[in-house]
Design a protein with these regions (language model features):
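Loop-to-helix entry and N-terminal half of a specific, functionally important transmembrane alpha helix
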Residues: 24-30, 77-81, 331-359, 372, ...
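Alpha-helical transmembrane segments of multi-pass inner-membrane proteins
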Residues: 107-110, 114-144, 149-212
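Long extracytoplasmic/lumenal interhelical loops at the membrane interface
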Residues: 146, 260-315, 320, 336
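Hydrophobic, aromatic-rich transmembrane alpha-helices
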Residues: 3, 7-12, 28, 51-66, ...
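Aromatic-anchored transmembrane helix interface
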Residues: 47-53, 70-86, 91-114, 153-157
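Transmembrane alpha-helices of multi-pass inner-membrane enzymes
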Residues: 53-56, 346-353, 362-400
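Hydrophobic transmembrane alpha-helices and their immediate junctions
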Residues: 15-18, 62-63, 71, 314-353, ...
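A membrane-periplasm/extracellular boundary helix in multi-pass inner-membrane enzymes
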Residues: 187, 191, 209-258, 279-282
Length: 400
């Protein structure tokens, strides 16, 4: 396949960085304003409800041409808006939470208008995101800035900002300064005490370093398949590992580095997994179709698979998994065409899926950070441009 995405061929206009670069750091900072636990507790309401609805209305108002090309998504969004508005008025309404979580899954589509078209502008915007996240990380780790926020929540917010380095490194793996900043952020993130984040940092770094072999189709598919299945496999691994020599070794590391020894290596999660399995398997109807409400409104299973299965059932979970597979397959088309930016977004999304083994914040739960959906929106935007470019090229060949 011709590498149509290389050497800035995706640029609509060659030249200076476009103003749209500012949207990437703005969306990152919005995660702190509308998506954090601190804001929810301070205002007594979940402002991400209003944000998601607002962004969808913006999509309808200013992106009509794209909606006409993808009317299926447009009508689906429209049909969900009205019941969401009604349910938002109900205090702690379970159905409202479920619809809210379903709307969140559409964010990669409705955030696409905010994504720049060309490589240069995207890179500039991502540098801006990295700078903001490193500044916040420095203030948090050394001066206690926002120190009263949940440490895991801060870990996600900070990591998914500086993770933009993964995209930049995918384009230039020999840039020593980018690796220095990456290592600095990793050390500083240890302050959050999040083992999940530490693992995510290591995973993204390995995916960048092993970009060559991972770009092979069968290796790529093995990696994303395992990442999708890992939240399902992890509860069994955690349960079987308790009491083994490996568990004792990990317990020592947990106590010395992360100061979380009291809850064990997994902070009591195996017990939560057993309870979640009981709830999900209460009846075959619940097992297949779910409860139609979010688990996090009353119970935290700390596992992305259990959260989805409880809310949407096995059938709904398989539909969501199918959507993720579709996303990764389209991403590979871009990677195969030489698109390093899409490869970096792929690496970040793999780390996000691995984090779902012991957390459930990505899908089927409250909106904690916009950034995973921003990285997905980058891929969607680039894929749409790529397809249009291929159509134009094929049209020219036919004319000739």
């Amino acid at each position: 396949m011709q590498n149509v995405l290389r050497d800035n061929q995706m640029i609509k206009k060659k030249g200076d960085v476009q103003l749209t670069a500012i949207w990437l750091p703005v969306l990152y900072l919005l995660s702190f304003i509308v998506c954090s636990d601190a804001v929810r507790f301070s205002f007594g309401m979940d402002l991400s409800f209003l944000f998601v609805l607002g962004i969808i209305f913006f999509y309808f108002a200013f992106y009509k041409n794209h909606i006409s090309k993808a009317s299926f998504y447009g009508w689906w969004i429209y049909l969900l808006i009205v019941p969401t508005l009604i349910m938002c008025l109900m205090k702690d309404g379970d159905m409202g939470h479920m619809i809210h979580c379903t709307l969140i899954m559409i964010l990669p589509i409705v955030l696409e208008p905010f994504i720049p078209h060309d490589d240069k502008t995207i890179s500039f915007g991502l540098y801006f995101v990295v700078g903001v996240s490193l500044l916040l990380l420095f203030l948090y780790a050394n001066f206690g800035f926002l120190g009263n926020w949940n440490t895991n929540c801060m870990g996600y917010l900070l990591f998914l900002g500086f993770a933009a380095l993964t995209v930049l490194l995918s384009k230039n793996r020999k840039n020593v300064w980018l690796w220095v900043f990456y290592a600095y952020a990793f050390v500083q993130l240890l302050v959050t005490g999040s083992r999940n984040i530490s693992i995510a940092v290591i995973i993204t770094a390995l995916l960048v370093l092993l970009k060559g072999p991972i770009s092979k189709k069968w290796v790529y598919r093995v990696i994303y398949t395992f990442a999708i299945l890992y939240p399902l496999i992890f509860p069994w691994i955690a349960t079987e590992m308790v009491g083994t020599a490996l568990y004792e070794w990990l317990a020592e590391i947990t106590e010395t580095i992360y100061d979380k020894g009291q809850g064990g290596v997994f902070s009591g999660r195996p017990k939560l997994y057993l309870e979640a399995e009981k709830l999900i398997g209460e009846s075959w109807v619940h097992y297949l179709f779910g409860y139609g409400r979010t688990m996090v409104s009353f119970y935290a299973a700390h596992n992305g698979y259990y959260v989805l299965h409880y809310t949407y059932g096995l059938i709904g979970t398989l539909v969501i998994v199918g959507a993720l597979i579709y996303f990764f397959e389209k991403t590979f088309i871009l990677i195969n065409a030489g698109d390093s930016i899409s490869y970096g977004c792929f690496a970040i999304m793999i780390s996000v899926l691995f984090q779902q083994a012991s957390e459930g914040w990505f899908l089927g739960t409250y909106l904690i950070t916009l950034m995973p959906f921003v990285y997905m929106a980058i891929v969607i935007k680039r894929y749409r441009i790529y397809i249009q470019k291929r159509k134009n090229e094929n049209g020219k060949e036919k004319d000739e």
